[in-house]
């Protein structure tokens, strides 16, 4: 029997096992409905090799705002890494680095594309190589994944990392996805490999907030995406009016997340977001587990992230005023409602019982199944995610708004 996630969600849930019409899955009892796909299909590495290429894209149409000691710039500079499928024998990736510089592979893209493209949004203080194993996993299953360093929220941002630029980040994702699809010369094979009619976005923490803006915001949403996955999204700042558009979305949560607790992050987003939306709660999982981080000696490895975020906020302007202006520009002031942001950073402690490797594996299963369901039209993948995933894994709860 499923365990309840909490009264904050009770009125919104349609529990796993109920008849549903989500992502092409018909009601229980239909004779022509497919069986759920096997979890091993989403856990195992895919049939493609994986390689990476590094780029620096410059959007000359949008500025980078001033930030502390940084005067700003008339353009937005976006170092980015692309993970892409190759032939199985050409499994070679560029050396991961925090900011630019790695010599990328020149391996050709697999010839049986084009492939869906996924834009990945990193979290606060992080970078484009965040959760690299997840990106490799998706690329091995036939996805082109691109992740930029956002100008003012990455760990080495000029003037110090800030939340204030969050509202500009969805357009950064759209820009780099378009840039890859338009490449020529020695990178023309990447452009040919991208199916721009099949696009998804995903992200973690502040990048999860970026994903929510791109999916739901009445003005800043991205028109050309079909699916989204938000891991531990920062959502306490978004009011009910924020969720103005419907998009098939998976929200990933860890019940032991100290940085973005379930109730004020993914749970709040699930409460307000229009269907179809799925909430996956990983019992005992935390925040940094979505990057695969394991610190076995710690009661909760989020402690290291808590200290880093608290120090960054204490040492600079968090940028809330700038973020509010961006979110409410040409939109109702009700898109912003910080009433749930009433706790200090990591004020509530939780016991982490799920290891980071297991958490990242389960997150990858959920993300891949969702993208397969939406971007490749696989009803068996949708049925797995909404019915079999929780049944197969006692540490997983799944709730659905069809």
Where are the language model's segments positioned?
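Alpha/beta-hydrolase active-site loop
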Residues: 163-196
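C-terminal motif of bacterial Sec signal peptides marking the signal peptidase cleavage site
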Residues: 24-27
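Bacterial signal peptide processing site
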Residues: 29-31
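Short substrate-entry loop that stabilizes the transition state in hydrolases
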Residues: 107-115, 120-157, 258-262
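The feature captures the conserved acid-bearing segment of alpha/beta-hydrolase catalytic domains
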Residues: 222-290
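Gly/Ala-rich beta-loop-alpha elbow adjacent to hydrolase catalytic centers
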Residues: 203-207, 211
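Domain-level recognition of soluble alpha/beta enzyme cores
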Residues: 33-119, 140, 307-356, 390
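Alpha/beta-hydrolase-fold serine-hydrolase catalytic core, especially in secreted/extracellular enzymes
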Residues: 275, 284-286, 292-402
């Amino acid at each position: 029997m499923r365990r309840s996630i909490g009264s904050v969600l009770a009125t919104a849930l349609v529990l796993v096992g109920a008849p549903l019409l989500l992502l092409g899955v018909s009601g229980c009892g239909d004779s022509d409905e497919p069986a759920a796909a096997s979890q091993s299909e989403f856990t195992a590495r895919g049939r493609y090799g994986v390689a990476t290429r590094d780029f620096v894209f410059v959007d000359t149409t949008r500025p980078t705002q001033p930030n502390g000691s940084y005067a700003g710039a008339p353009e937005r500079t976006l170092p980015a890494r692309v993970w892409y499928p190759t032939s199985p024998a050409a499994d070679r990736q560029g050396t991961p680095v925090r900011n630019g510089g790695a010599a990328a592979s020149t391996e050709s893209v697999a010839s049986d594309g084009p492939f869906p493209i996924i834009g990945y949004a990193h979290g606060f203080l992080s970078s484009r190589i965040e959760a690299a194993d997840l990106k490799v996993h998706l690329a091995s299953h036939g996805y082109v994944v691109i992740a930029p360093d956002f100008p003012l929220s990455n760990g080495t941002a000029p003037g110090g990392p800030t939340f204030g630029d969050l509202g500009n980040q969805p357009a950064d994702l759209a820009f780099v996805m378009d840039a890859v699809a338009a490449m020529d010369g020695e990178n023309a094979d990447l452009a040919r490999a991208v199916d721009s009619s099949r696009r998804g976005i995903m992200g973690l923490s502040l990048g999860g907030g970026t994903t929510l803006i791109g999916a739901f915001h009445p003005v800043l949403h991205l028109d050309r995406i079909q699916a989204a996955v938000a891991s531990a999204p920062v959502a306490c700042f978004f009011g009910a009016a924020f969720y103005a558009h419907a998009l098939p979305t998976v929200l990933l949560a860890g019940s032991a997340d100290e940085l973005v607790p379930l109730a004020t992050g993914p749970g709040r987003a699930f409460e307000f977001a229009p269907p179809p939306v799925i909430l996956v709660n990983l019992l005992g999982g935390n925040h940094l587990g979505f990057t695969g981080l394991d610190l076995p000696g710690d009661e909760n490895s989020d402690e290291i992230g808590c200290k880093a975020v608290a120090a960054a906020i204490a040492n600079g302007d968090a940028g809330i005023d700038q973020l509010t202006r961006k979110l409410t520009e040409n939109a109702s002031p009700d898109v912003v409602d910080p009433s749930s942001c009433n706790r200090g950073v990591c004020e509530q402690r939780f016991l982490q019982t799920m290891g980071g490797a297991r958490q990242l594996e389960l997150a990858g299963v959920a993300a891949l199944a969702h993208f397969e369901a939406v971007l490749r039209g696989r009803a068996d993948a949708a049925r797995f995610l909404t019915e079999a995933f929780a049944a197969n894994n006692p540490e997983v709860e799944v709730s659905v708004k069809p």
